[in-house]
Amino acid sequence: MNESVAKKTQETLGKVIKKPPLTEKLLSKPPFRYLHDIFSEVIRTTGFMKGLYVEAEMKSDNVKDKDSKIAFLQKAIDVVMLVSGEPLAAKPARIVAGHEPEKTNELLQVIAKCCLNKLSSDEAVKRVLAGDKLDQKGKPSTSRSQDKENREGREHHRDREERKGIKESSGSREQKDPDQPKDQESKRDDKDRRRDAERSDKGRERERTKDRDRDKDKSRDREKDKTREKEREREKDRNREKERERDKDRDKKKERESHKDRERDKDREREKRREKEKDKERPRETEEKLKDRGDRKIKAAEEISKSKPQPEVASRTHQAETEEAESPSRIPRPSSAKGQRRKPKTGGQGTEQDETESEGEAEGPSAEKPIPLENGDVTDPAALQTTHSRRLPRPSSARPAAPRVKRQESYTDATPAERLGSGKTPASVILDGKKLSEDEDDEDGQFVVEEAAPPPSDVPEVESNSLELQGDDKHGGLVKKILETKKDYESSPSSKSKEQDRSLVSEASRKKERELVAREIERLRSSIQTVCRSALPLGKIMDYIQEDMDSMQNELQSWRKENKENAQALLQEQRITDGVVEPLKVELAELEQLIKDQQDKICAVKSNILKNEEKIQKMVSSISFSSQT
């Protein structure tokens, strides 16, 4: 396509519309959507062709089929031809296919002229909507009857000319042959009458055929109008159905979104309820855990305390036996004696027993329970108090009591000398982590016996032995276990309080963490909602950007190609000019050389002239001198 055609359309149509860019690329091969945008913009700005298209046709999305595109363009072409009166060679099928860009540009130019001249298109729009069609020459051709009428008119004109010629010939013959007989004239008149009758019959038949053709054409036009109206109604129904489907889809989408929002709200409410229930259940669980731990520790302490009293009872029985041995009136108890010995509280021994009882009470609530002995007897604290006043006989089946270590205070008490002979050697000291051997278990009567009035030299030895026993007693296995359980039991309430404090601190910190996490989740939700809201417009923008980018890239490529072509053409022109200028440059150099040569010659001639003038002056002076002389 020539660039002049595109420039002409840009000049003419650019005065009418501004919106769709009238680029050479688009005008060289205009797509249908581009033409649709141009027509809609012309209708919007100038009002030309207003009322020609329905609202559905004004949207390019509804005009996608080939037939609808052809009908759209045909309407515009018919209106433009009726308004302008100029014939247009543009065919809508070729325009839709992308061919004949020059003819489409001519159509656009004619539209621009009509808009600039402010020609009204109301009558043309009405005629086109009524169904009037135009031929390529610009004349309305509603039916074939018009062509027939034209043909018949031509035939009438020919018949008239023939009649005139016959009359002229007859007149000339009359003038030439005045002497012819009247019979010939009558014959001619008969012939003329016959011819006239035949012609009139033919004319009547022609008129009848014309009327029939007109009726047929009218019926055809009516049928065409009916079919067009039916098609329009169908198109309207289709458009209405499409709009209804779109409305239904929109309603469904809205319902889905509302349903989703409701489900989200319900899920949030459920999560909040669950969190509240969890928050309510957590302090209960912590309290139950603390109670379980306390119960477990109490049970463990009770079990330990149940296992403790056996050595204490044995030590008490052994102490009672030693006290009996100290008194001068008592006889050493044989190993086969049954029952238990109990000594009343007297002096330092009573204080020792009080100390042991206080230790038992400090160890826990298990001290108040009945204490089981090794032989299966059970002793209560009330029974222990009664044994101070009344002693039960020791059973023969009882196991021998463990050796009781005498404290240093007891050595100061006076003991009778009568027990020295009957007293046995002191029991061997229990080592760390070792139990009594079988030999020691077999010995029934190993008790600690003290002298009534030991000599002063023997006192330090007894004291050293008691100190060793005390040191060894600290490292005894049973005593060690008792002390450990006692320490554990004493430390258990403090540990419970610490654990409670820790649990309270941990719960407070957890609540703070939950609040922080909830705030962060709310922030994330709000940010996600904003992102989702901005996603749809962003997607639409991206779609439009993609279309614009494609067109811009194509335009850029075309401009680059044009730039390259222009650069190449410029280089070629420069080469051509250089080739043309080179001989001129040579000629110029030659001319300059000739000018220099001529200047040199002129200078030489001037010098000769000056020399000749000098010679002439000399000659004149010599002549004048000679004449004077």
UniProtKB/Swiss-Prot annotation:
Keywords: Cell projection, Cilium biogenesis/degradation, Coiled coil, Cytoplasm, Cytoskeleton. Residues 394-403 have a biased composition (Low complexity). Residues 130-511 are annotated as: Disordered. GO terms for cellular component: axoneme; ciliary basal body; extracellular region; intraciliary transport particle B. InterPro entries: TRAF3IP1 (IPR018799), TRAF3IP1_C (IPR041476), TRAF3IP1_N (IPR040468), TRAF3IP1_N_sf (IPR042576). It is found in: Cytoplasm, Cytoskeleton; Cell projection, Cilium; Cytoplasm, Cytoskeleton, Cilium axoneme; Cytoplasm, Cytoskeleton, Cilium basal body. Residues 352-362 have a biased composition (Acidic residues). Residues 220-282, 511-602 form a coiled coil. Plays an inhibitory role on IL13 signaling by binding to IL13RA1 and recruits TRAF3 and DISC1 to the microtubules. Involved in the regulation of microtubule cytoskeleton organization. Is a negative regulator of microtubule stability, acting through the control of MAP4 levels. Involved in ciliogenesis. Belongs to the TRAF3IP1 family. Component of the IFT complex B, at least composed of ift20, ift22, ift25, ift27, ift46, ift52, traf3ip1/ift54, ift57, ift74, ift80, ift81, and ift88. Interacts with ift88. Interacts with il13ra1. Binds to microtubules, traf3 and disc1. Interacts with map4. This is TRAF3-interacting protein 1. The gene is traf3ip1.
